[in-house]
UniProtKB/Swiss-Prot annotation:
Catalytic activity annotation: a quinone + NADH + 5 H(+)(in) = a quinol + NAD(+) + 4 H(+)(out)
Protein's name according to its UniProt entry: NADH-quinone oxidoreductase subunit B
Protein family: Belongs to the complex I 20 kDa subunit family.
EC number annotated for this UniProt entry: 7.1.1.-
Source organism: Helicobacter hepaticus (strain ATCC 51449 / 3B1)
Entry membrane topology: Peripheral membrane protein
Keyword Membrane: yes
Cofactor section: [4Fe-4S] cluster
Recorded GO CC terms: plasma membrane; respiratory chain complex I
Function recorded in the entry: NDH-1 shuttles electrons from NADH, via FMN and iron-sulfur (Fe-S) centers, to quinones in the respiratory chain. The immediate electron acceptor for the enzyme in this species is believed to be ubiquinone. Couples the redox reaction to proton translocation (for every two electrons transferred, four hydrogen ions are translocated across the cytoplasmic membrane), and thus conserves the redox energy in a proton gradient.
Amino acid sequence: MAEHQVNYTQNNGLPIVLSSVDKLLNWSRSNSLWGVTYGLACCAIEMMATGGSRFDLDRFGSIFRASPRQSDLMIISGTVTKKHAEFVRRLYDQMPEPKWVISMGSCANTGGMFNTYATVQGVDRIIPVDIYLPGCAPRPETLQYAIMVLQQKIRRQKALPHLKPKRLI
């Protein structure tokens, strides 16, 4: 009699069941991005326009929330001063895991034209940023595209990073 060997793992070594759960969790996380907005300057107007009926972020599953405790996405737009840095960090720390950040506009990305002692030269000096949107001010379509790119990034991530594949032999 021939013995059949059954391989219950996929290419990355995780069991098939965990890989399926991984895909399901990533799909659900990517299609329900609830963002807390932190608009500080002109880019906030474009961010508000993106949430309006003309651009309709709801069809991507993205809703703007007022509380960071209900959000998994933070969108920062405008010039961040050193006084604001503490509040940005506090809002980021209040968000539940997993969390993502979009930096919108030249001022949030690099400090923009405000190279002064009171300006933070890029929000990535305070919190980790996943996607940078260039421009002054970026169009609402750019923010929509950034959310779509973030959704693709989330789908590729490992939903359960703390699980390590076990060797059976």
